[in-house]
Every structure is written in C-alpha cells, then in structure tokens.
Amino acid sequence: MNRRRFIKASLALAAACGTPGLATLFSRNAWAQESDIADGQTRAFDFSVLQAMASELAQKPWGGAPRPLPDTLAKLTPQAYNSIQYDAGHSLWNNIEGRQLDVQFFHVGMGFRRRVRMFSLDPATRQAREVHFRPELFNYHDAGVDTRQLEGQTDLGFAGFRAFKAPELARRDIVSFLGASYFRAVDSTFQYGLSARGLAVDTFTDTPEEFPDFTAFWFETPKAQDTTFVAYALLDSPSVTGAYKFIIHCESSQVIMEVENFLFARKDIKQLGIAPMTSMFSCGTNERRMCDTIHPQIHDSDRLAMWRGNGEWVCRPLNNPQRLQFNAFSDENPKGFGLLQTDHKFESYQDVMGWYNKRPSLWVEPRNRWGKGTVALMEIPTTGETLDNIVCFWQPEKPIRAGDKLNFQYRLYWSGDAPVRTPLARVYATRTGMGSFPEGWAPGENFPTQWSRRVAVDFVGGDLKGAAPRGIEPVITLSSGEAKQVEILYVEPFDGYRIQFDWYPTSDSVDPVEMRMFLRCQGEAISETWLWQYFPPAPDKRKYVDDRQMR
C-alpha cells in the first residue's frame, strides 16, 4: 500500500483514474431547448439507465489516466487555484425564484485533472442535459489563468461541485464533492472536517491503493421550497464501476445523505471498502506524543464508534501510532459505525484557525443487509494536522470476483453527535500517563522505582448512579501484561465515574497491547465496551528519570 497524503480543506488531490468509451454511453441524444447553463442535448435518464451504463462500462477496459490539461491550468499553485471562483450568477438553479438550494461547480486545474461531466435532470420528464465548461462560468481574479487557452474547450468538464442552502446561497457551502470520489458535508457550524468517499479499493494490501473517480453527476432540479436534492453519480476505476444515487437532506442542524450504489467488478478485488471515511487524529487526551504545541488536542475525530449487529456498543479511541496499524473488527449486519468528534469545547483545542471544536461527526447507518465482514480501521503515523491519517470502512467477508454485482444502501449523518447512542453508560474520555504512584501524589518526592502506564477511562450516562450502591465492577481484559491498582472514582464535574488502572508489562515485547473494558453490576453489563490499543516502549525506556537540578 502506498502511503497517501491528503491536503486538508478542499484540496485533497485526486488520483488518476479514467472512463473509457464514455462518449458512446451518452451518444443517444436529441437536441434540447437551452435553458440557463445546461446547454447540451437531452437524453432520457433515471437510476436504471445509470446502472446499465455502469454495467456496460465494466465490460470495457479502463481508459487510464486523465489526458493533460492546458498548461495554464496544470501549473496552478494552490493559492492561484483557490482564487478561481464560480460566478454565482451562473449557478445551476439560479433561475428558480425563492430557492432554498443551489449548486456551483469547481474548476479543473492543479491536481484536479479528472474532467467530470455535469448534467441537469428534469425530474418530471426524466430528460437530462449536459452543462458544458466555458470560461464565463468563472471569475478568475488574479489566478493568472490564460483564458485564451480555454476558449472552445467545452470538454474540459469540471472538478466537482458544492451545494449551498439559503440564506447562504452563494457564500457558505454545506456539501462538497471534489477529487476522486471524496465528499464532505457540514452541520450547523458550517465547519468542514472529515471526508467520506464513494468507494475504497485495496487500502491495506500488498498492491497500490486505487482511488476510484466520480466521472459524471446528474442533478434533479428541486422545487423552490425543497431542502432536499437528488444527485446521481457514475464511478469508475481500473477494478470497478458503480452507479450511485444520493438523496441529500440539508437540514438546519445536520446533513443526511441517503446513499445507494450498484457496483460492477471489472477484476478480482483483494479489499473493497464500503462507506469509507478519512479523518485526522494527531493528538488527544489519550495520545500526547504529538501535542508539543499550544493546543491541548488536535483532531478531526476522537473515536471510532460501532453499534454491532448483536446490539453491543463499542468505543475505540483513535491513535497516532509510531508505525502504521490496521485493525479489523468482525461483525454481521452492523447497525451502524462512524468516526465521531465528541468533544466540542473550545478550551479542549484552543484553535482559532482549525476550529476543531466545531468539526462534525460522521455516522453510517446500513439500510440493507450487509452480511458478514469487518469494520476496518487504519491509523497512519502523522507529524501534524495537515495529513489525514485515519481511514475507516466496511469490508465484506466474501471475496470480490470479476463480474460480481453488489448493492449497498446506507445513510450518512453529518452532525455534531451521532444520531443514536447507547442507553448504557458511554465512554466520555480516555486518558493516559505515568503510573506506579498513589493518585494525588504525582509523582511525589520520589519517582516510582517500577515503571507502569496509567490508563483512566471516564464513563457518563446510563444508570451509573443507580448501579453505584449495588457495586460497579470494571471487567478488564488485556492481550498482555497485568492491570493493577484498579480504582473506581466518582467525578463530580462531569457527573460520571473514572475507572483507572496501571498497566504493568510482563515481558519485553513491544507489540501493541489490546485493552478491553466494560462495566458490570451484579452480573449485567451497564456500559458500552471500551477498546484501546497501547504501544509499550522498548524495555530500556521503561524507567522514570528525575532530571531536576537542585543547585
């Protein structure tokens, strides 16, 4: 697997994929009456047409990398590219009076070389017309683009699109599709964070990762009062094609996407990732190694949450490990999973540029039976906040063979918190630090002579208070080492309980330690399950050094 570097905000560079014979798939046309920016020919279109298109495309060889862009676009710097702005007067639904939604397009250029085709679709007649590229759709400002090189190049297409909602119809977008099959959405804070993808291919295998492209979009024209719009997308890559339908609900406090896809495998696929998402975790309450800045925490997401098919709720805090880690959590017909940002307090981040306290969570809710598989989590070492280092997706257990057709239906919730949560006690935070000393004597006049690592897991909610008089029992399981000095502490500021223990190694191994804990009362589970992966230091580092200078 090649390590991927993702540029934050909206500049994740798209990988090179292609669409062979696409012109022939759109060729059964008749001239249409022009209206607004849609200037192409009409063609009957619905989701079944798109499925047939993707199926036909899968029978053809992949077309390879995008052809070169004009030099004036290919050599743009990120700053120059960002200065190119779509002209709001030419927005897709600009002719709808009193509209609640609108769409604008991204310019091709810089690393965005894939020419994505855009179509306007009349939902009543099911007739689609293409929107061709032309320079007058954009304001180039001081980007330094020689627009003479672009005249007449109607096949340049676009790099992607973004959607707006009233009253911010031209100023603050709420949905963005840009680069390969990446897309994002916001909640009421208008702050982008983690990204989703249409599909992941061979993310963690012995072959290079493949980044499928969305190569064409069709937008159903909404009614003026609608706050929901429908978009269809064609996906293409060397190994697979896909027909996608997105029903995007732009609510006041969140964006909900209903997604359905039909996938057609061109070849055998070692690892297929469904509903993939990518995020960033540099440091947090449980991982302090990379927090030598003024910021207490730096992350888009702090945990992987899972609602398993058997009803168990699982919380897995994220790591920024020193070496790449890939973990797979087996399940059957999962009820949901996602990367969550649960801490929304400014003081936890002290960041006036990234505003990590405003970043949304992303929750996946399967809508059909996904069968057996795993929730996959990859954590890549990163030195800072500009690299996305967290990847999560569903991997079906059944191998994908050439000629296979698959169908997945799910919802994506972009919101401050997950739309559902366990009725049991849930993990509030995970903290780690020096062990082997009595709490309240940190570390006292004398440093501990025996090395250990303290772990504190805070639980809130559920029936913790009712269970306390009857006895709360932490059930701790470790893959290696021992848990000692286990304490149960009530913490008034967050009205919950802290379970803390010291982990002592029983060998010189530096392999990751798998930790698991849940709370029990009189034999019954009263909390979700906490999972964590700890990376012990080398044996010669397992000591405390008192480096004070008293003279």
UniProtKB/Swiss-Prot annotation:
Top-level division of the source organism's lineage: Bacteria
HAMAP family attached to this UniProt entry: MdoD_OpgD
Broad class of where this protein is predominantly found: periplasm
Function in brief: Probably involved in the control of the structural glucose backbone of osmoregulated periplasmic glucans (OPGs).
Stated name of the protein: Glucans biosynthesis protein D
Gene transcribed to yield this protein: mdoD
Similarity field: Belongs to the OpgD/OpgG family.
Gene Ontology molecular function, alphabetical: carbohydrate binding; catalytic activity
UniProt xrefs under InterPro entries: Gal_mutarotase_sf_dom (IPR011013), GH-type_carb-bd (IPR014718), Glucan_biosyn_MdoD (IPR023724), Glucan_biosyn_MdoG/MdoD (IPR014438), Glucan_biosyn_MdoG_C (IPR007444), Ig-like_fold (IPR013783), Ig_E-set (IPR014756), TAT_signal (IPR006311)
